Amino acid sequence: MNNTISDYIYMYLQYCQHQKKLSRNTLRAYQIDMAQFIVYLNSQAADRSPKEIDKKTIQAYVDNLATHYAPRTCKRKIACLKAFFSHLEFEDIITVSPFRKLRIAIKEPRVLPRTIKKADMSILLQHVYTSAKETNTPYQHFNAVRNIAIYELLISTGIRIGELCRLQTDSIDFDSGTIQIYGKGDKERTVYLTSDIVKKALQNYALLREQLTEISTDYFFVNWNNKRIKEENVRSQMRKASHALLHKRITPHMFRHTFATTLLENKVDIRYIQELLGHSSIKTTQIYLHLSNASIRTALNQAKLREQYS
């Protein structure tokens, strides 16, 4: 009996999980994208063999995606599918990937990363520190001290929210001032604790964490029930605080953008920034060059150089 493309997708996802060691979020996205492709194929004909998938089928599917999704989402879904067929070609399941010599042009408008203004950052930091002093219960105090550690770590290292939530206690070395981060694709990198303020915030939280009874997890950031803190919990707290204090939406990823832009504006080599952010390609980091240029233009406009000679 010949395997259908659904069978090969299942095997590919197993390969991604157990051999490529993709993160849970990436696997979930792959599952959704692959299932969507199967639904499309079934709407056109019966589930078929990968050898029957040709360029016309792929192009028609890409056109279908483009009518329903934003360019960035389309690119992600296409990249997932392209990786799948490349895997089939590598394993000699198909002779050649239908993506070979297939030109897919999806224009994505360039959107500069949103950063946090210095004044807004000061207000947020002041808020989390003040909250820790005004708590009435051990539960409230624990959450407040943990929030301080989260905010300080995000702004001082630029790590992703997923990386923060998956951070292990033994990955932090206070003596050397380093943290080992396992990013996308389980790629390991080092970030640095160069501020005593940040170290103290993390150590204060670590002390409270140790005082919790029956610690049953190696994750550094936990909730009151000793469970790993969820990304949505961090986003929710930050969303509520920023709306209440600033009347705007601040996200954890904006801390990352702010970290990178601040380094660039302080003349840090972009290759160092690439390493700290865990970007596999320098092109991803180069978007901050455009953001820095925008900051330069704003500064020049505010200076009104020519008007000074009128």
Range-by-range predicted roles:
Residues 1-310:
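Conserved catalytic core of the tyrosine transesterase superfamily
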